[in-house]
Amino acid sequence: DHRDLHSFPTRRSSDLHHQLKFIHLAGTNGKGSTAAFILSILRATGLKVGLYSSPHLVRFNERIRVNGVPIADEKIVEYMKLFSADIRRIESTFFETTSAMAFWYFKQKKVDVAVIETGLGGRLDSTNVIEPKIAVITPISMDHSDLLGNELKSIAREKAGIIKEKTPVISSHQENAVKNVLVQKAAEEDASLMFVDS
């Protein structure tokens, strides 16, 4: 049951998508380590960097971080007070609500760049309302086949959904079936695509 990507709360935060600079990550394996690597490079240049990732290991707050510091409990409470009526009204999912909270928090903290991991797939993921400066795709393998399909090609098509028009894409080495899907999607979007060895 896929929902409209532009429903609240992501739609309510839509103005933020144009005010923040994003790096968008999708893939089956290695998203967390890749995000950490990107983060360390950006922070080494003096930039203020947000990270939205899932799942958390101990506390929910770990999902939303700025320069490695998790969002404070008080900020989570503030967000829920502001938007709880809308969240209940349209029965926003957990991940939609959390994604919108991350965008809102990164805007408040005035981050220079926000690194955003998809939670499930890519094409219909609630993070896919953003217009990233660059898309990064880690190795794709069988993943959430009950929701994304039971063939590698169908899963690759879902993950490739983060490729946007004229947006540079960097992908790790992929199996041929996956590579073909990414090449086709990049061509459709007139996006430059580069494969790198992991």
Regions found by a protein language model. Give the residues of each.
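Aromatic/hydrophobic pocket-lining residues that form π-stacking "cages" and hydrophobic walls in ligand
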Residues: 38, 102, 182
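Acidic, Mg2+-coordinating active-site environments of NTP-dependent enzymes
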Residues: 110-117, 132-198
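Glycine- and other small-residue-rich loops at beta-strand/loop junctions that grip anionic moieties
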Residues: 27, 95, 171-174
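Buried hydrophobic positions in well-ordered alpha/beta secondary-structure cores of metabolic enzymes
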Residues: 25-28, 32, 49, 99, ...
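Short, small-residue-biased leader/transition segments that mark boundaries at the very start
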Residues: 1-2, 6-13
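ATP-dependent carboxylate-amine ligase catalytic core
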Residues: 15-18, 44-130, 146-148, 176
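Hydrophobic (often cysteine-bearing) scaffold residues that line and stabilize catalytic clefts
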Residues: 5, 34, 95, 178
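Walker A (P-loop) phosphate-binding motif
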Residues: 11-57, 134-136
